[in-house]
Regions:
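Topology signature of small-to-medium multi-pass alpha-helical membrane proteins
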Residues: 1-217
Length: 217
């Protein structure tokens, strides 16, 4: 019994610490008027508190979330080279090597964090105690599948959109509005009330910037 409680306390402390750091960074970004979004912060602190107190019900929830985030970030990392043209990756590295490397390092850190949380909460003492207490102790297969699907499906849809008529039209309009001096990479598209709105990345050797175009269907 003591061993499983020690594992929960260890994971709880890490989650609380990570959540507090994330909240502090969120406050900093708000004060600097920078955009920032995260899946951790408050949820990590709350989950950490429950685990620290030895809640086996929280074990199932946090394990599911860790499995989902692990598969999500691993899928993102694997698909990363294919999400942008090689030339755009090269331009990003040349213009902001530190920012790009920090972004990749953050993704790797998140993968390692969620892997550690998952393996800790799937350790034999925790699984055994959860099962004996009547809580679910099965592998969260759906969480893994959902994490992969939420990366692969949108990426696949965007790939086909770029190669379709709508993608070509978005690039054509962007060239008209923002000039021929840029190359354009489609990053998002939405349809509403007969209008189409597309988000693109415009880039050349000197700069990279986000642009938007809109047209009627």
């Amino acid at each position: 019994m003591y061993k499983y409680r020690a594992i929960l306390k260890r994971v709880g402390i890490v989650l609380i610490a990570v959540g507090i750091l994330d909240i502090a960074y969120l406050v900093y970004c708000i004060s600097q008027q920078k955009s920032y979004s995260s899946s951790l912060n408050i949820l990590a602190v709350v989950g950490g508190v429950f685990l620290f107190r030895g809640s086996l019900r929280a074990v199932h929830i946090v394990t599911w979330f860790a499995a989902f985030m692990l598969s999500y970030f691993v899928s993102v990392f694997i698909l990363l080279p294919f999400l942008k043209p090689a030339e755009l990756w090269g331009t990003e590295f040349r213009l902001d090597p530190v920012g790009l490397c920090l972004s990749l390092l953050l993704t790797i850190t998140l993968i390692a964090l969620h892997f550690w949380i998952y393996t800790q909460l799937r350790a034999a003492p925790v699984v055994s105690e959860s099962f004996n207490s009547g809580h679910s102790a099965s592998t969260p297969k759906f969480a893994f599948i959902l994490g992969v699907a939420l990366v692969v499906l949108p990426a696949g849809m965007m790939h086909f959109t770029r190669g379709g008529a709508a993608g070509a039209k978005a690039v054509e309009i962007a060239r008209t509005q923002y000039g021929q001096d840029y190359k354009y990479h489609l990053t998002g598209m939405s349809w509403s009330n007969g209008n189409v709105r597309a988000s693109l990345t415009a880039y050349n050797e000197q700069e990279i910037k986000p642009v938007q175009v809109e047209w009627e269907q």
